[in-house]
Amino acid sequence: MEHIDLQCHTVASDGELEAKELVDLALKQGLKAIAITDHDSIGSVQKAIEYAKDRGIEIVPGVELSCDDPLFDFDKIDVLGLLTDINNKKLADLIKHINSQRDENKKQIIEKLKGMGYKIEFNDVKMAVKGTFGRPHIAKYLLKKYPEKFSSVADVFDRLIGVGKPAFLETHDRVSIEDGIKAIHGAGGVAILAHPGIYPQKESLKLIDYFLDNGGDGIETYYPYHIICPELKIDERGNEEMIKFYKSIAAKKHVLESGGNDHHGNFRFTLGKIKIPYSVLENIRSRKAL
C-alpha cells in the first residue's frame, strides 16, 4: 500500500529541514506524497514542488494557520489548509498580518527581557530566524549567550518566557476559526482541524462541531499522539485507539479525514511513523473537485 504524510514542517516555520531535505527524507521513507504545512507560512511550498519534479513524489501545497476562538480556552487551535493556491493574495495577506503581529509580540518580550538585565536585541535574534518568529528563537539566543545561566531551551521557557513567567506576553497573532476557514476556501483549499486529540475529549468534540458548523471540511484522524504528546500518557496501542475514535467521528459526521505525523526534525522524528493510506489524499482531492 502507498502511504502519505499530510502534515510536515520546514525551516519556513519551526522545522529543522530545508524543503529539499524534507523531500529527500520523504523519498527515503518511501512516501508517495507529503504536504508542506508550515505554521503561518507558505515559503517552502514552491521550493518543494520544484525539487520534487521527476522524483516520484507528490507535494501537496498547504499551510497550518494559527487560530483561536473565545468559546475555547486553548492557547491555539491549528487549522490545516490542504491543496491551497499559494499565490492567492488574500491568503498571503492574512499570513503577512499574522507574522507582523507575531513580530510585534516578540519585540515586546525582548524589551521585557532587556528590562530584566539581559543583553538581547530584536534584530540580532531575528537574523537567525529563517521562518516564522517564535519564542523558541528567543530561548535559543539566550541559551547561547548565557550558557552559565540556562541549561536548555526548556529551562529558558520555565524561568522566563513560558506562559505565566516574568517575560511572557499574550500574543495576538491568531485569526478566528471562521476567518481561517474562509481564507483557506478562498485559496481553493480544504480546511482540516489539526490533531483534535490534543484537547480534552469533551472539549474536542465541541470544537469539532464548531469547526464543521463554520464550514470546516474534516478532521485529522491519523496523528502520532503517543510520540508528540507525552502528557497524554498513551502508548502505541492507545494511539491506535485514538485514531479509531476520531475516524469514527469523521465517518459519523460524513466529513473528510486527513492524517499527518507533524514532522519537525530529527529531534523528534515522526515522518511516516503513522501509516496513512494514499486513499486519504484521493478522497480530499475528490471533495475539492465537487
Question: Where does each model-flagged region fall?
Answer:
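Conserved phosphoryl-transfer catalytic core
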Residues: S100-M127
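Glycine-rich, often acidic, oxyanion-interacting loops/wings at catalytic, nucleic-acid
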Residues: F133-Y141
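S-adenosyl-L-methionine-dependent methyltransferase catalytic core, i.e., the SAM/SAH-binding region
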Residues: P136, E148-I161
